[in-house]
């Protein structure tokens, strides 16, 4: 059996899809479906069982036996960069992850987990998986950073796989439940379908991020699991592209020459807490042996727009 926490969420459900595509169906999805809309992410996928997150944590703490577990992909977390309840964030992202890690270590079960590029904070270069380059801007980034630090202490003594992925700006299918935290491409597509011009923050041509297509992020997870590689790795494309490039790709897919991108004022509450530039350094990822290419914004957004608008 393979366990995917956060399996009804964005990246988690795409990992389930990638596993299905390779013939794996004996999958236990762990999630919190209080937001019932997330079920749609699983509706076309094959899983063996579902378990509520709170029940799962209780079972982990009790040391319950789940049988033969081939791997745990731990994607379950609060991923909101605008959530400032530190106790909630640390319970969800730090404490829960520690408990699950030790459960895996005791059983020598491969443990692959979601870290984040938010660990790097507001820097504009050297996005390298080393302590001197890390200084998160928000409590979400701090919760991910602290767990990475915890893993670093354990890795030298671990005799089973522990692998963390610092996701950069992930976008693509199955993110619709994320609301305001969904990708720019998702929101621009919605605006156009509502007969509006797509809107970007003023200065967006100067904001550059490393946008990675979710299918590529899932492929990284599966490759590392199959190859048994441990460590903490950036999961991005190694290319920074502008929000304007995302908007241009979305508009291009809609084939409507009347569309023009509007620029709106930058929100006050995000000033000083917003990464203006991200670009994954892939040196460590490539050195580990991962050599597959990553989609450009134009390629990934085109595939995503076809998926989003397939029923229209």
Curated annotation (Swiss-Prot):
Belongs to the NAD(P)-dependent epimerase/dehydratase family. HldD subfamily. Contains a large N-terminal NADP-binding domain, and a smaller C-terminal substrate-binding domain. The active site is at 140 (proton acceptor), 178 (proton acceptor). Pfam families: Epimerase (PF01370). The keyword ATP-binding does not apply. The keyword Isomerase applies. It catalyses: ADP-D-glycero-beta-D-manno-heptose = ADP-L-glycero-beta-D-manno-heptose. Its cofactor is NADP(+). Substrate binds at residues 169, 180, 187, 201-204, 209, 274. This is ADP-L-glycero-D-manno-heptose-6-epimerase. GO terms for molecular function: ADP-glyceromanno-heptose 6-epimerase activity; NADP binding. Pathway: Nucleotide-sugar biosynthesis; ADP-L-glycero-beta-D-manno-heptose biosynthesis; ADP-L-glycero-beta-D-manno-heptose from D-glycero-beta-D-manno-heptose 7-phosphate: step 4/4; Bacterial outer membrane biogenesis; LPS core biosynthesis. SUPFAM superfamilies: NAD(P)-binding Rossmann-fold domains (SSF51735).
């Amino acid at each position: 059996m393979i366990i995917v926490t956060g399996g009804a969420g964005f990246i988690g459900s795409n990992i389930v899809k990638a596993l299905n595509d390779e013939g794996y169906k004996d999958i236990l999805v762990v999630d919190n479906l209080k937001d019932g809309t997330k079920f749609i992410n699983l509706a076309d996928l094959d899983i063996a069982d579902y378990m509520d997150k709170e029940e799962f944590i209780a079972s982990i703490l009790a040391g319950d036996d789940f049988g033969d577990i081939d791997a745990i992909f731990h994607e379950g977390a609060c991923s909101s960069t605008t959530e400032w309840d530190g106790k909630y964030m640390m319970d969800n992202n730090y404490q829960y992850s520690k408990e699950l890690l030790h459960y895996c270590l005791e059983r020598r079960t491969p443990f692959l987990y979601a870290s984040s590029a938010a660990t790097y904070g507001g820097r504009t270069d050297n996005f390298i998986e080393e302590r001197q380059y890390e200084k998160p801007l928000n409590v979400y980034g701090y919760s991910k950073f602290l767990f990475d630090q915890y893993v670093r202490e354990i890795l030298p003594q671990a005799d089973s796989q522990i692998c963390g992925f610092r996701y950069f700006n992930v976008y693509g299918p199955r993110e619709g439940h994320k609301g305001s935290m969904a990708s720019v491409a998702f929101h621009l597509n919605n605006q156009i379908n509502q007969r509006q011009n797509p809107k970007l923050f003023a200065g967006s041509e100067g904001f550059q991020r490393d946008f990675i297509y979710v299918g590529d992020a899932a492929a990284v997870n599966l490759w590392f699991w199959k190859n048994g590689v441990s460590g903490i790795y950036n999961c991005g494309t190694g290319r920074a592209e502008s929000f304007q490039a995302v908007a241009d790709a979305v508009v291009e897919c809609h084939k409507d020459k009347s569309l023009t991108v509007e620029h709106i004022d930058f929100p006050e509450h995000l000033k000083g807490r917003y990464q203006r530039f991200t670009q994954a350094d892939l040196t460590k990822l490539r050195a580990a042996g991962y050599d597959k290419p990553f989609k450009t914004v134009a390629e990934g957004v085109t595939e995503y727009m076809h998926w989003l608008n397939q029923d229209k």
